């Protein structure tokens, strides 16, 4: 009985053991599954954190690259702007220098023409004065010749007085009636001489008066001509001074126009920059827009024109 019973119990025990072992196996498997399932969220969290960190790193790197590119682009734009402004200033200076040279050439031509006119006038005046001087010399020479002629005439008069009709009549009277005395004879001769000399002197003075009248008329003409030349010289001097004043005024107006033009250019450049900044803010908020150098290169020449 006991053996039979023990034989019957052994399979049951083994079955129980198998069931127990199976249950224990299931339990350990479930535990392992649960452990595995409990570990998966941690791994996911770690992966998410890692992904977020990588994302932040990428974003930071992208922001750094973006800032570097923006700085580089800004520096390039500023350099290009300065280069274009320098070129524009150089062109403006060249144009102004060309204009000044043209005006200087024009003024030089005008001054040379005025100088030529003055030289011509001076030459004419010099020739006129030379002619006047020569005329005066000739007049003096004529006067000397006239005095020589007068001396010869006086000598001739003396001779004629001695041979005059009065003298001859007086000598015949003396021969016919005798001499009235030495004293009266000398007085009468002196009187005859004085009468003849006075008559000749009256004729000479009349001739001299006519000559002086002609000389005075010629001197009046020369004085009038001299006054006319002097007035012309004064007018030329005044005109030259006016030309100098006009030249100074034109230079001052040119400098003022240049300063006004530069102010307008600076104001226009400032307005263009403000316009671009407002456009950047309107498109991208506070972040400056990255625009190409080509577009700025096309806009900047418009600003400096």
From Swiss-Prot:
May act as a scaffold to regulate the recruitment and assembly of spindle midzone components. GO terms for cellular component: cytoplasm; midbody; spindle midzone. Residues 13-41 are annotated as: Disordered. It comes from the Eukaryota. Residues 42-167, 216-278 form a coiled coil. GO terms for biological process: spindle midzone assembly. Its main location: cytoplasm. This is Coiled-coil domain-containing protein 69. It is found in: Cytoplasm, Cytoskeleton, Spindle; Midbody. The keyword Cytoplasm applies. Keywords: Coiled coil, Cytoplasm, Cytoskeleton, Lipoprotein, Myristate. It comes from Xenopus tropicalis. A lipid is attached at residue 2 (N-myristoyl glycine). Belongs to the CCDC69 family.
